[in-house]
Amino acid sequence: MSIVNRSAYVPYSAEYVYSLVNDIKNYPCFINGCSSANILEDLDTHMIASIGIKKAGVAFKFTTKNLLEFPSSIEMHLVEGPFKYLTGCWKFDGLSQNACKVNLTIDYEFNNKILGAITSKIFDQIANTLIDDICARADTLFMKVE
């Protein structure tokens, strides 16, 4: 079992950061280690998406159903993949029009203990930098608008 819990205060609205996190189809453009992203179902209340991970010679794919509560949270539940279980939650707490606190919690365990020992380190690295990658994407897109 592994748990990732990260948070950050960012100089952007909760709505803006929520939209970037929910922009899964573009993850390969800005999430380190994400090799593919496919949206399988996209509704107002939820999204089902498949993500490919490829880093340091390790590659795997997983699918989650994401429950959407704009602009406050995105809750992730495993549909399929190499995990025994995987759940996660993004929370966006608006502090002002131009600031919010972002929190990401991911709880998971890989099916295969031996493969999991290697893969878990890579998944931890990616999960631990997700907020940084989202913030960098926000900075890049915000500067293009200014």
Residue ranges of each PLM-predicted region?
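Hydrophobic/aromatic beta-strand elements that line small-molecule binding cavities or substrate pockets
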Residues: 6-8, 62-67, 87-94
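Short, highly charged C-terminal tails/helix-capping segments
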Residues: 136-146
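Hydrophobic pocket/interface hotspot
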Residues: 17-21, 27, 49, 66, ...
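Hydrophobic ligand-binding cavity/cleft-lining segments
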Residues: 1-44
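Residue-level preference for beta-strand/loop junctions
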Residues: 2, 43-45, 58-60, 84, ...
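Beta-strand/loop substructures that line and gate deep hydrophobic ligand-binding cavities in soluble
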Residues: 78-129
